[in-house]
Each structure stands twice: as C-alpha cells, then as structure tokens.
C-alpha cells in the first residue's frame, strides 16, 4: 500500500531527479540567503520577528496543512521558530503567531516568546477538535 498522498509522492519523485551538482548549487544558494538574513538581523539589531503562521485560518479537515508561504523562509534559513496558538475563529479553526529568533539564540527566543504570551494574556486555547 502506498503511504504517500499523490502530491507528496510526486514531490519525492521530482526530488530523486535532482543531480548532486544541482543539489550542491541549491544548498549554496540557501547558505547565501541564510548569511543575508543573519547579517540583516544583526545590522538591524532585530532580536525576533513576529509573523502570522499563515495568511488565513487553518483549513478544515486533514486533507492539507494549509498555506506554507509565511514559514517556508524560516525553514530555508534554519532560523529557530516558536509557534504560539492565539485563538480560534467562528468555525473553531486555529490561528497562530510565529516568533522567529536569530541563529544560536534559542534561549532568547524562548524568553521573548514567554514575554509575548504573558503580554497577550494567552491561556490555553479552548477548542472542540476531534482528531479521531
């Protein structure tokens, strides 16, 4: 039995076609972006960025995880990220913030995230999710 969804399987098959040279070039490009973001944060004296996790609410059901545009850059750069659930909409679908820290400053990110949770007075989000 195939355990992958069609899109996941297609993505994996495309990945297998990438040559070692192409992979090295992609990784080099990712490293350039990592270095740029690190320098930008340092030069701008930015301890953390706050951004929505997604441009919209979470999708209903388990067919998709939703829109990844708001967090793919952090995956590419390897920056540490903490996601803070901040509420649910009228359909009981969650929305969240992501707090993005700097390289090697995970402890500072934890402190900043705790401060944000306390400032926003976020308690446990009430929901009626049934994952069964």
Regions from the language model: what does each represent?
Residues 1, 34, 41, 116-120, ...:
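Structural signal for hydrophobic packing residues in well-ordered secondary-structure cores
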Residues 44, 54-72:
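Short, surface-exposed loop/helix-turn segments at secondary-structure junctions
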Residues 36-39, 69-71:
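Generic recognition of flexible, low-complexity loop/linker segments
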Residues 47:
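Conserved acidic residues
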Residues 1-38, 85-96:
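Short helix-loop capping/hinge segments that flank enzyme active sites or metal/cofactor-binding pockets
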Residues 24, 62-63, 76-132:
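Structural helix-boundary/capping segments
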């Amino acid at each position: 039995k195939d355990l992958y969804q069609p899109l996941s399987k297609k993505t994996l098959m495309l990945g297998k076609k990438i040559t070692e040279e192409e992979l090295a070039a992609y990784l080099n490009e990712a490293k350039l972006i990592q270095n740029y973001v690190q320098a930008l944060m340092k030069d701008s004296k930015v301890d953390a960025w706050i951004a929505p996790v997604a441009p919209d609410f979470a999708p209903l059901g388990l067919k998709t995880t939703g829109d990844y545009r708001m967090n793919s850059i952090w995956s590419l750069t390897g920056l540490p990220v903490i996601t803070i659930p901040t509420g649910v909409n009228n359909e009981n679908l969650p929305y969240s913030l992501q707090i993005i820290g700097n390289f090697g400053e995970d402890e500072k990110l934890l402190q900043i995230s705790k401060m944000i949770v306390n400032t926003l007075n976020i308690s446990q989000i009430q929901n009626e999710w049934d994952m069964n």
